[in-house]
């Protein structure tokens, strides 16, 4: 009987951890806290965003940034964000961090979006902290000025 209970518990854990693990990790052991967009700047026909956050976990490697873009009367879009570290894997020490310039690509890029005033942007920064799953940090939403 005891062996069966251990086997059932192992199966439940094996099925639950990959599903619930990322959500639990983000709440209990986040990579970034107090993250917010602290500035926007119009550069040509793009908007550049600057971000401030408190870095908590130095072992996590930066992967990329994705933006969820919501515009009035249009379907929600997702775009890979251009950052100074695009294409590079980096890790920063714990403490207050300033990040940017982050730019959402413009058309004709397939991910391109015209960032008009009133557009709502939410950034998702992806980190690799271990081999089980990627860890996400959410920043925003913020309204484009």
Task: Cite the ranges covered by each PLM segment.
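A short, structured loop/turn motif at beta-sheet edges
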Residues: 42-45, 72-74, 108-120, 145
């Amino acid at each position: 009987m005891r062996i069966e209970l251990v086997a059932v518990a192992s199966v439940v854990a094996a099925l639950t951890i990959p599903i619930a693990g990322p959500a639990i990790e983000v709440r209990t052991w986040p990579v970034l806290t107090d993250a917010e967009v602290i500035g926007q700047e119009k550069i040509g026909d793009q908007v550049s965003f600057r971000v401030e956050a408190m870095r908590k976990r130095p072992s996590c490697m930066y992967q990329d940034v994705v933006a969820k873009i919501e515009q009035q009367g249009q379907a929600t879009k997702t775009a890979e964000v251009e950052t100074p570290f695009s294409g590079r894997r980096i890790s920063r020490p714990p403490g207050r961090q300033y990040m940017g310039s982050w730019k959402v690509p413009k058309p004709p890029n397939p991910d391109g979006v015209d960032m008009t005033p009133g557009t709502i942007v939410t950034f998702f920064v992806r980190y690799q902290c271990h081999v089980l799953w990627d860890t996400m940090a959410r920043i925003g939403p913020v309204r484009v000025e």
